[in-house]
Amino acid sequence: MLSPKRTRFRKQHRGRMKGISYRGNRISFGKYALQALEPAWITSRQIEAGRRAMTRNARRGGKIWVRIFPDKPVTLRPAETRMGSGKGSPEYWVAVVKPGRILYEMGGVTENIARRAISLAASKMPIRTQFIIS
């Protein structure tokens, strides 16, 4: 699973997802890509599941680029804990994704193979996505 090696602070505010993605919204490595259409937090497990689905489907052909990285810690409190006594401990990492953001890219394969592999990755995502060609 992806996570930062080290961060400046252990815990972060939740923040809010406004507007569209102005960065990371163009295809820059491969020829085909999966683009987010909704805002969401995508966990490192979901990113990994999508990547695995793509690599298994494409077999040895082509190359895959993961364009998002989970750099935001999500804290959870233990079950049946009373309110107060501080913020919970970091449990997992998420990537903050806004509409327009490229999630995965693929190159070196035919369009129908890429379409099939990317649709498998899209089914692992918690949001609506679209397949785009550069």
Swiss-Prot record:
GO molecular function, one term: rRNA binding
Localization terms from the record: Plastid, Chloroplast
Keyword Protein biosynthesis assigned: no
Keywords of the record: Chloroplast, Plastid, Ribonucleoprotein, Ribosomal protein
Stated name of the protein: Large ribosomal subunit protein uL16c
GO process annotations (BP): mitochondrial translation
Coiled-coil features, chain-numbered ranges: none
A GO-annotated cellular component: mitochondrial large ribosomal subunit
Domain of life: Eukaryota
Family: Belongs to the universal ribosomal protein uL16 family.
Main location per the UniProt record: plastid
PANTHER family in alphabetical order: 50S/60S RIBOSOMAL PROTEIN L16, LARGE RIBOSOMAL SUBUNIT PROTEIN UL16M
Organism lineage string: Eukaryota, Viridiplantae, Streptophyta, Embryophyta, Tracheophyta
Description of how the protein assembles with itself and partners: Part of the 50S ribosomal subunit.
Entries under InterPro entries matching the protein: Ribosomal_uL16, Ribosomal_uL16_bact-type, Ribosomal_uL16_CS, Ribosomal_uL16_dom, Ribosomal_uL16_sf
